[in-house]
Amino acid sequence: DTALLRKVEFPSDIFDIMALEMHWPDFTSARKRAEDYARVQKEKAEGHREVTIDEIYSVLRERYNIEMIWMQREIELEKQSSIQNSYIFALYERLIHVGKTVVFTTDMYLPKDTLKEMLEASGYHDFCDIYVSNVYQLRKGDGSLQKKLIEKYPLKKIIHIGDNKAADVDKSEKSGMAALWYPDCRLQKREVFLNNLSGSIYRAIVNNTLNTGLWEHGLHYTHGFRVGGILTAGYCEHINEVAQQKRAEKILFCARDCYIIQKVYNAFYRKVDNSYIEISRYAVMNLSPERYANDILDRFIFRYWDENKNAKTLEQLLHDTGYNFLVPYLEDNDLDRFIYCSSASKELFEEFFLSHIDVLKEHSKASREAATAYFGGLIGTSKSILIVDVGWSGTCISALEYFIHDAISPDIHVSGTLICSSNTKNMCNQILGKYIVPYVCGPCRNNDFNNFMMPSGKKSVREIDMLHMPLEYMFTSETASLVDYFKDNDATVDFVRDVNTPKNINEIRE
């Protein structure tokens, strides 16, 4: 476990693989008991506890009727799961380069020849010997194997390197040789909810990459490696499952949060034709003000209103939120354009806004025409589409569905999927109706995790951002959010963007 690492977290996880292949869930336990029994019998007969894999499988054959062919399978899996520890290998190469003698030691039941094959397969070719506990009936755990090594090289300074503090360092020093501790690559804190074989493989990948001593990336890159890879892989498989269930002929990945997800999907998981679509809640809701006027008020106007009560006039408010074309109508409705938001009546402003939906619709005509051409071109002849987003309320999915049915064709079947959803009643109903299918969590799926991501009670913006942003910025693009659709002079659809280019571009890139 120092020179070589495994593709699983613990050595006994190899037994779990065998249990699956044998269709015998209790094999892992039986294999451990057989080894313990073999060691006890060896100690009674010969005064030591070092056993070979043949002796372990002799017990398995006698007690559980396990054929010896499974011993060869275990050896084969050990070979297949072993990989080079790049940090130790770099040290090994340097030692060989300066003419040092390298000897490997291990407390192990595998044959010496097998261990030699495993080392050589990982690039270790120029070592002098392997001291294996089952060959000498001695072990590092009590220092006796180290003493045997000292007998071989009595006039040499020996430095022992290992990841077991007690055996590799304390016992080595007690036996008379110098020792260096190389900390175990395995995490001290494990995710117990991944306490299975898939979790073992995942943790091995993370541990063997992050914890050998060669990892030099920052916090954000590390977060992406630990979380982003496995999450994206699982989500892409989920997308294909939902697409198959819904018989989707086209997948639409929503900007900006699905920028990376679409790239990964097309590189490794592509089964359905797909496009990355330019969209935002603001842009798509303003295509259909007759449906989303109240949402527009709550999400974009009143939120800004509350943040700038004593700093913005109504005219400035409408200008900053993109509705400056409504300013001339204010005074006709007893609203002073120069009055600060704190002095204005929200109820009166809401009545004003909702009574001018026809003005909003007229203003959005050119945008609707451009958006109709844009989405119609992407959808083509598809009769069923799946819209993919990251989270949380599914607004882009539902608003785009409404626009498609209203402006393109009511016969197109639209469904959606999210990594995580909110826990609102509306979202729960959409999930129960199988219109939106969440991946990781939602009101009807992994509800404990959903409650963590969407905590009840009043929370600050920062608290919510700390829950949601680490998920979103792993996948998002670096571009500013979309404001509007329009057509160029040559009738090509183009986009108006906000000036809010992300401030954390370096973190996003990491």
Where are these regions (language model features)?
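Acidic, divalent-metal-coordinating active-site segment for phosphoryl/phosphodiester hydrolysis
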Residues: 164-179
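Flexible inter-domain linker/hinge segments
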Residues: 186-235
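Active-site neighborhood of HAD-like aspartate-dependent phosphohydrolases
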Residues: 2-33
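Short glycine-rich phosphate-binding loop at a beta-alpha junction
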Residues: 103, 107, 248-255, 385-388
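Long, contiguous domain-sized segments
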Residues: 216, 220-224, 228-235, 286-299, ...
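Substrate-recognition "cap/lid" segment bordering the active-site pocket of phosphatases
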Residues: 103-105, 109-157
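Conserved beta-strand -> loop -> alpha-helix junction used to position metal-binding or nucleic-acid-contacting
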Residues: 29, 132-135, 186, 272-287
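Short, acidic loop-to-helix structural element flanking the phosphoryl-transfer center
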Residues: 46-104
